[in-house]
């Protein structure tokens, strides 16, 4: 290892030594300077131009000693590229610096007017793109994916009229897509996925690219309608995890269903309406179809029997009714089938079980027996779920854990095993045989009754005992106190109670793992506590970091109803919500499991951050993101979902300081009588002082308190709301501004934020704005955000 390092240093020293022998006005000199500045180990010897051009796979030159192509992918180049290096190679046509650790680009890079292909993917570039990117008039391929580039996509990109491939995915681009992009009519592939792009797409976007084969806009914040994107040449379209709305037929130009080229279509997690189009039969190459989680009208199963290439089909939460057609058995290549959360009826049809790996038919109204060939295949599948139907099954080989996870509310109709009475060498006496059978049945029934009585007694005793998690949180019990029991029986029971990990079905755990990871839910592992229960930090088996929310006991919901609620919560997806990834139902304890992404909550940011005050831009970003999350719960979910505990402690900030609202949907799992005046805090509206249940309007009030907390930097204690409202009525709202903000405070913006907080905290619920209106008001404060 030492010899190798010493050899690299010798190479590098020799490389720098001969740099001075090159003409400073040649490509050889600029290239040598580039490799030297980027600390390239094992660099090529630079004493002649030919030695540079002979380095295989990296540099290609012409006879005039011009560098035409540079391919330096994955060479561990690091740092900033200085000026007067590659930016001076005026004949350069191809530049591939992908898979390195480059942090910034030289200002003269954009002068390379002959550049045809630029690949800077998988680096560490964070600075915004300059407008002079439009100088690349000859560019065909632009790949800046997997960086941290922020700001807008510059309008000057419209100058790249020869562009065929645009890859900007997995960055931090914000705002909307520039309208000028529609002038790049040669585009074959567009990938803008996994950014923070929002607003509506430019007018004519769908029909602007007649040659387009691949479009990926997934995992952004786009809204509005999209017209004419599913034209006859397109092969791949992914619009998932956005806020697109409008009729689904608008996607089809002229409503002509000619999709002979379509291979991949994903429209999931949007708000499209209408009916699933029945013209899919022409898409004979279609292999991946995902239309899940939209707002389609009630409809029968679409025609899919001719989609022989289909290997992935997800139509969950698409409002399907009636039966699953038998023609689905023709799909012999199908690997994933998800039809969950619909209103499907009838029997489970015979499926082609040869290739299937994932099957989810849960939360429907299916009845009858599950086909035996399908049951026999389940052991070889990655994931399956038949829960919450009217189905029956018989497979004595299933473990109790499997039944509790995938057959919830499903009847096991396996008969009791009975050994036949066999008499060897003697004639059977029918009278004695009948007597023995009767006696055996009587004894069996007696044992059964005794067993049932023992179970009832055990349950009664267990109800009277103190629960292990909630009591510990409420009473602050010490780990070794006599009130806390941890008997061998408890441990045995804990190992038999499964944990359901929704997106990680192969991750097998039990309640015992959760207890071990939190030291039996010790207060020392608690992250925060609220009305919906304490939340504990844990590292689960396999190194999975989790946040475990223990919901207080006493709810009137059955285990089945709680399971349904958890499954539905797990399907709610929004960039500003902290998603549920699993759950555990343990007698009277209901545990929600979230992935702990090492986030900080807003309460800590504002009040436990010493002298390091959060700037106004960040505070506005947090307010807007939280408002969007609440607007989605109130107006994007059917039926509308009340949060019930909006406060600084339940607003988490990820690594990009994007807010994630936690604990949503848990209010349904609490007592019907929501905690009243004895648990009031500064976020509670006046009407809840009378033990009223939380409402959409009370969520708005709580958000208003959070907004005033962001503006003032004060904790919601004492009389914060009345103090700020009094200042506003006196025309002195600016006095509420947090004096610790470090930057020059845009007083006009903060004054508007104070007014929004004033509106949200109105005494009368009907005077408060909706969360949709609040989002609009916050966007108007800083329209460029």
UniProtKB/Swiss-Prot annotation:
Ranges facing Extracellular side: 22-436
Membrane topology: Single-pass type I membrane protein
Phosphoprotein listed as a keyword: yes
Sequence positions that bind ATP: 527-535, 549
Localization per Swiss-Prot or TrEMBL: Cell membrane
Domain commentary: The protein kinase domain is predicted to be catalytically inactive. Lacks the conserved Asp active site at position 645, which is replaced by a Glu residue.
Family classification: Belongs to the protein kinase superfamily. Ser/Thr protein kinase family.
UniProt name for this protein: Probably inactive leucine-rich repeat receptor-like protein kinase At5g58150
Classification lineage: Eukaryota, Viridiplantae, Streptophyta, Embryophyta, Tracheophyta
């Amino acid at each position: 290892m030492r010899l190798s390092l010493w050899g690299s240093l010798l190479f590098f020293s020799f490389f720098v030594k001969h740099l001075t022998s090159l003409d400073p006005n040649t490509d050889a000199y600029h290239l040598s300077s580039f490799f030297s500045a980027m600390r390239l180990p094992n660099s090529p010897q630079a004493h002649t131009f030919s030695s540079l051009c002979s380095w295989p796979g990296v540099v290609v030159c012409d006879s005039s000693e011009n560098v035409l192509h540079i391919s330096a992918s994955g060479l561990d180049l690091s740092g900033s590229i200085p000026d007067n290096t590659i930016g001076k190679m005026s004949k350069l046509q191809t530049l591939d610096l992908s898979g390195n650790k480059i942090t910034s680009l030289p200002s003269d890079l954009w002068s390379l007017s002959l550049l045809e292909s630029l690949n800077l993917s998988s680096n560490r570039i964070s600075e915004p793109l300059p407008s002079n990117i439009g100088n690349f008039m000859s560019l065909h391929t632009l790949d800046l994916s997997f960086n941290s580039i922020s700001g807008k996509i510059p309008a000057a990109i419209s100058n790249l009229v020869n562009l065929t491939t645009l890859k900007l995915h997995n960055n931090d681009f914000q705002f909307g897509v520039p309208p000028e992009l529609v002038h790049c009519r040669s585009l074959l592939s567009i990938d803008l996925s996994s950014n923070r792009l929002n607003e509506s797409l430019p007018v004519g976007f769908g029909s602007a690219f007649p040659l387009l084969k691949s479009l990926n806009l997934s995992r952004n914040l786009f809204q509005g309608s999209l017209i004419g994107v599913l034209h006859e040449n397109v092969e791949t379209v992914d619009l998932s995890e956005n806020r697109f709305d409008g009729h689904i037929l608008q996607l089809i130009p002229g409503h002509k269903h000619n999709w002979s080229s379509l291979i991949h279509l994903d429209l999931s997690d949007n708000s499209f309406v209408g009916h699933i189009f029945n013209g899919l039969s022409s898409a004979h190459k279609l292999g991946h179809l995902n239309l899940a989680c939209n707002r389609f009208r009630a409809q029968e199963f679409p025609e899919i029997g001719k989609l022989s290439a289909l290997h992935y089909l997800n139509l969950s939460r698409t409002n399907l009714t009636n039966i699953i057609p038998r023609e689905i058995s023709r799909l012999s290549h199908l690997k994933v089938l998800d039809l969950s959360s619909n209103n499907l009826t009838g029997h489970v049809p015979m499926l082609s079980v040869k290739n299937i790996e994932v099957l989810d038919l849960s939360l429907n109204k299916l009845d009858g027996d599950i086909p035996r060939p399908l049951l026999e295949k389940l052991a070889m599948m990655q994931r399956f779920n038949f829960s919450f139907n009217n189905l029956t099954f018989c497979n004595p080989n299933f473990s109790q854990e499997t039944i509790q996870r995938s057959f919830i509310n499903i009847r096991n109709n396996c008969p009791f095993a009975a050994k036949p009475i066999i008499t060897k060498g003697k004639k059977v006496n029918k009278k004695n045989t009948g007597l023995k059978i009767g006696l055996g049945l009587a004894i069996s029934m007696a044992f059964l009754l005794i067993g049932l009585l023992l179970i009832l007694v055990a349950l009664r005793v267990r109800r009277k005992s103190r629960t292990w998690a909630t009591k510990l949180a409420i009473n602050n019990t010490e780990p070794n106190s006599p009130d806390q029991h941890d008997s061998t029986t408890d441990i045995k029971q804990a190992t038999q109670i499964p944990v359901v990990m929704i997106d990680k079905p192969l991750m097998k755990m039990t309640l015992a793992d959760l207890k071990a990871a939190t030291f039996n839910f010790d207060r020392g592992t608690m992250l925060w506590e609220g009305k919906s229960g304490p939340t504990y930090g844990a590292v689960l088996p396999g190194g999975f970091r989790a946040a475990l929310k223990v919901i207080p006991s006493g709810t009137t919901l059955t285990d089945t109803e709680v399971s349904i609620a958890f499954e539905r919560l797990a399907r709610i997806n929004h960039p500003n919500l902290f998603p549920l990834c699993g759950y555990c139902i343990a007698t009277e304890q209901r545990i929600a499991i979230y992935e702990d992404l090492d986030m900080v909550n807003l309460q800590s940011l504002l009040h436990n951050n010493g002298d390091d005050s959060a700037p106004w831009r960040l505070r506005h970003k947090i307010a807007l993101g939280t408002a969007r999350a609440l607007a989605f719960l109130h107006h994007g979910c059917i039926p509308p979902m009340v949060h019930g505990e909006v406060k600084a402690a339940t607003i988490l900030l990820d690594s990009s300081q994007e807010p994630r609202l936690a604990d949503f949907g848990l209010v349904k799992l609490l007592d019907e009588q929501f905690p009243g005046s004895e648990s009031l805090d500064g976020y509670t509206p006046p009407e809840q002082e009378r033990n009223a249940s939380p409402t959409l309007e009370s969520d708005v009030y709580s958000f208003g308190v959070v907004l005033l907390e962001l503006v003032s930097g004060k904790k919601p204690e004492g009389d914060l709301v009345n103090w700020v409202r009094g200042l506003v009525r006196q025309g002195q709202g600016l006095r509420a501004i947090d004096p610790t903000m470090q930057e020059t405070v845009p007083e006009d913006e903060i004054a508007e934020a104070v007014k929004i907080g004033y509106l949200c905290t109105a005494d009368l619920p009907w005077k408060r704005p909706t969360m949709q209106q609040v989002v609009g008001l916050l966007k108007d404060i800083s329209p460029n955000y």
